[in-house]
Curated annotation (Swiss-Prot):
Keyword entries, A-Z: Disulfide bond, Protease inhibitor, Secreted, Serine protease inhibitor, Signal
Compartments (UniProt record): Secreted
CDD domains: KAZAL_PSTI (cd01327)
InterPro entries, per database record: Kazal-type_SerProtInhib (IPR050159), Kazal_dom (IPR002350), Kazal_dom_sf (IPR036058), Prot_inh_Kazal-m (IPR001239)
Keyword match Secreted: yes
Signal peptide: 1-22
Cysteine disulfide links: 32-68, 46-65, 54-87
Protein name, as recorded: Serine protease inhibitor Kazal-type 12
UniProt GO cellular component terms: extracellular region
Domain Kazal-like: from-to ranges: 26-87
Biological processes annotated in GO: negative regulation of proteolysis
Role summary: Inhibits trypsin.
Amino acid sequence: MKPAGAFLLLISLACLFLSVDAVSQGGFQAFCSNYEKTLAPDGKSCPKTHKPVCGTDGKTYQNRCAFCQTAMERSLGKLGFKHEGKC
C-alpha cells in the first residue's frame, strides 16, 4: 500500500472512532432525535418497555424514551448516553 493510501485509511479510522466516542460520551441530540417530535408535554408518552440504558449521570433509565425525556428536560448537554443496559 502506498504511504498516501495508508495515511488516508488511518485518518478515516480515526474519524470513525472519534465520532463513535462522541455519541457514547455525551450528546443526547443524535441519540434522541427520534423522540423529540413524539414526546408529549405531559411526559406520559413513553412506553413501559424495559430496555434499560445508562446515562452519564450514573442512573439507569427504563428505556431510550425515558432517557431522552430526562435529557431534553435538562438540556444544555448535562446528560449524555453512556451505554445500553444497566449502569
